[in-house]
Amino acid sequence: MIRTEEMLLNVGPQHPSTHGVFRLVIKIDGEIIKEATPVIGYLHRGTEKIAESLQYTQIIPYTDRMDYLSAMTNNYVLCHAVETMMDLEIPERAEYLRVLAMELGRVASHLVWWGTNLLDIGAVSPFLYAFREREMIINLLSELCGARLTFNYMRVGGVKWDAPDGWIEKVKEFVPYMREQLEGYHDLVSGNEIFLNRVKGVGVYSAEEAISYSLSGANLRCTGVHWDLRKDEPYSIYDRFDFDVPVGSTGDAWDRYVCRMKEIEESLKIIEQAVEQFPKDGAVLAKVPKIIKAPKGEAFVRIESPRGEIGCYIASDGKKEPYRLKFRRPSFYNLQILPKLLKGENIANLITILGGVDIVLGEVDG
């Protein structure tokens, strides 16, 4: 008689494929995962509570450290919430700089995902190529704001600095270069039989399940749901750009891959149009007081980050600090479906599924 024995196995919190301090406790029977329990909180810093004792401008650097792979979108959602409460009109040049910064950040974020996800399942070369192109974007953003990762660039009313001389031309030159590299990425990976066997039909869920788990971003669109806040609830100046929203059909790891790769192409379209439409002159910061006091009341805004729908709720009592600040962090919500996806799966597919969800632990823990 064959007897099997279940075993508990810890993945993390210091495992290279969790990309941060994330612990996953799995119960396995042979090669099959019977149960998976995420353990989070190792990177919790109490950002929302700290914000209650900070001025609005002082909170911006804290947002950089949530989704540190896409800090510009975090900067923006906070500023956008305060601007909504103050009914501020943002200078046009500042809006274009914001869009350029956010879309460059989106491309850089997806490049990190592409390279590390493939490295985790055994492909080393794509990781090197992805970081080569990401370094070019980081250099562009560094020229713009002086930082490489935690940018602290946006302000309530606009941005801190104007683009330096020649910066727009460099961004313009980057777009065709990146498109050419994308073709190489697809030649290298997207048709590779070994890769396709690792991702097709793995980690499948339906549109109904995605919605019930509050998934967003590529994790939602891979099921065929056409939902992108840049298109469906345009903010900033996104209604001025012509771009598509990539969607999948089967909701597996392959569709999530395709959605993110196509999103890079769409971001390049937006960058190209923003460069062409970029105002020749103008202010980059609205006339706002040095110490900002949002009027009494509350506001909630949401935007599309590389990981999905990030929201910011502010309750103000008219002081220079928020009475209450709350972020809707997409990585936290996207993580919730992981136990369901892993149950009954072969342990060899664990890293493929985890990588496909694309979480950032600073955003999960807040």
Curated annotation (Swiss-Prot):
NCBIfam families: PRK06075.1 (NF004739), PRK12322.1 (NF008974)
Protein name (record): NADH-quinone oxidoreductase subunit D
Gene for this chain: nuoD
EC number: 7.1.1.-
Superkingdom assignment: Bacteria
Described purpose of this protein according to its UniProt entry: NDH-1 shuttles electrons from NADH, via FMN and iron-sulfur (Fe-S) centers, to quinones in the respiratory chain. The immediate electron acceptor for the enzyme in this species is believed to be a menaquinone. Couples the redox reaction to proton translocation (for every two electrons transferred, four hydrogen ions are translocated across the cytoplasmic membrane), and thus conserves the redox energy in a proton gradient.
Record family assignment: Belongs to the complex I 49 kDa subunit family.
Signal peptide from the UniProt entry: none
Quaternary structure and partners: NDH-1 is composed of 14 different subunits. Subunits NuoB, C, D, E, F, and G constitute the peripheral sector of the complex.
Top-tier EC class: translocase
GO MF, one annotated term: quinone binding
The organism of origin for this protein: Bacillus mycoides (strain KBAB4) (Bacillus weihenstephanensis)
One CC-aspect GO term: plasma membrane
Location in the cell: Cell membrane
Catalytic reaction equation(s): a quinone + NADH + 5 H(+)(in) = a quinol + NAD(+) + 4 H(+)(out)
